[in-house]
């Protein structure tokens, strides 16, 4: 099956630990897709256009962790999705809760075995989540432990936004503010950061205002200028 260039060619093969990474490179990460891309992908898989909206809602409004939870999608097409796509879902490994103010620190594992951290901070005005944007970091800031082992890789948009989804489900409350200030330099993962912002602020999804998003940087000036040209209403810190 040939997919347009910003999709991966789909190849079916048996799943096992040895070829897990190969398989995941062959499957399409649909949680990182915007609505237009998902619609085109679903049509290419032989389904009607309206299915894309249903699936997008399951992913970005109801925050399901598996295709099997999509109860208004036929079992036949669920299998097609499993054969051709992956639904990124972070695994919650540990939660530490501060006795002082109730701040919750999360340790999540990724599909490739790497781990990242996120933090939930509860305020009177709402719930704020601090997310990671990379596994490791190459900026070399002496005060930051994230850079000790260097950069492993940037997070996919799906891995960035699923930190918010998983924390929201864990506490059973809406997340109102997001800070990209965890592990990694967000502007060093620029394209994925922009897609994350698009998904985060989409009115068809979780719909968090750009004004409630803060991106922290150590000061990558060319990227800061590029971000300014995007004319977003986010806060750069």
Region roles according to the model:
Residues 10-127:
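Flexible, acidic/Gly-rich N-terminal and inter-domain linker regions that tether
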Residues 122-159:
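Canonical Radical SAM [4Fe-4S] cluster-binding loop centered on the CxxxCxxC motif
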Residues 147-177:
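Conserved alpha-helical substructure of the radical SAM core
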Residues 168-177, 182-237:
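Conserved AdoMet/S-adenosylmethionine-binding subsite of the radical SAM
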